């Protein structure tokens, strides 16, 4: 995979695929981490004398332009960070193809407003990529959070132009290689989030490689159910209970320390104001749902992680957006901020959680921008966006 250092960008028009998929509250960006993560590549290209056309997505819009998914707040924030105008183009026809234009940075509106970007039809994606390719001499791939998607701007477009990896993708791949090729031990993985179905593949793969596996978030209740406990109104993937039983058995066979909660925080409804109660996993009431791991479990998780030399964390331990159900996530974040080993925080929710709770990025070894992309890499899957950059 070639990098920015392998190319002279002077006078070139560059198509830069970024991951600028930031969380929004109305038009307010609540975490600009992904924008800041793109700056090293953008600044390198500008310093080298390139003119940049940025392609990026935001969320999953369904039917063309939707104001709530517009990149306008992103363009505005990027402009402030660069102290340069960033021109936002609504349509391809609004983009300038002139490398001598006074505008050094232009951004196409949310690439997912164009249905061809995510089309299942390869020919449709290729035709769209050909239209995009007219605006650049070279493609720079830097949207690590999207490299697991077979989308036109990620897979087809880089195959039509000379291509290189940006600073972010290069750094992400280097970090993930540390986790997969020869991690310092003990090696722990902490997985949270809502659905077991999103993580079952990576759990099955990692259980063969790790020393400690800690499970939290909504998906933990499928594990608790698999152990034979009642889980009340908690989230559960019923069709995966047998798979989860197999994972628990496999962990025992391999002597992997599988951390599951002994207590949880429950509430009658999914609400910020709902009264929170700590209960044992043996006594989850039928009319309550689990929304966080309990304080005893949080302490046990933190203790188990303290001596680890390599840790990968993806997904919060509970509904961290609600203060009453944020303590499990906070305890894990605190423990990981204090370990002397190498820690990778992966996934938008985990990164947003630590920033919301007042932690600094510098307190952790590496904050990854890739949620699903990181997980699929660790699962051993081939990622279309990386394949394209290696072609």
Regions found by a protein language model. Name each.
Residues 1-391:
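Active-site loop-to-helix "anion-binding N-cap" substructures in soluble metabolic enzymes
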